[in-house]
Swiss-Prot record:
Gene Ontology CC: cytosolic large ribosomal subunit
Taxonomic path: Bacteria, Pseudomonadati, Pseudomonadota, Alphaproteobacteria, Hyphomicrobiales
Name of the featured protein: Large ribosomal subunit protein uL29
Alphabetized Pfam families for the sequence: Ribosomal_L29 (PF00831)
Manganese is among the record's keywords: no
The family this protein is said to belong to: Belongs to the universal ribosomal protein uL29 family.
Keyword Glycosyltransferase among record annotations: no
The species this protein was found in: Rhizobium meliloti (strain 1021) (Ensifer meliloti)
Family annotation (Gene3D superfamilies): 1.10.287.310
GO BP term, pick one: translation
InterPro entries: Ribosomal_protein_uL29 (IPR050063), Ribosomal_uL29 (IPR001854), Ribosomal_uL29_CS (IPR018254), Ribosomal_uL29_sf (IPR036049)
SUPFAM superfamilies xrefs: Ribosomal protein L29 (L29p)
Molecular function GO terms recorded: structural constituent of ribosome
Keywords associated with the record: Ribonucleoprotein, Ribosomal protein
Length: 66
């Protein structure tokens, strides 16, 4: 997910997307532990998407406060 796409989302949509990605991250880690993971690069993609969403949510909160 690109940063421009994330910036277009509302605060509620950001929370939903974050929850979805955290659930996916959990499932990917579980698959890795059991040896069923096919695309190991997806773990890093999800991790970076989570960081992207958290960063933009924080920026939006700071802008609203200022």
């Amino acid at each position: 997910m690109k940063a421009a796409d994330v910036r277009a989302l509302s605060a509620d949509q950001l929370k939903e997307e974050l929850a979805k990605l955290k659930k996916e991250q959990f499932n990917l880690r579980f698959q890795k532990a059991t040896g069923q993971l096919e695309k190991s690069s997806r773990i890093n993609e999800v991790r970076k998407d989570i960081a992207r969403i958290k960063t933009i949510a924080r920026q939006k909160a700071a802008e609203a406060k200022a």
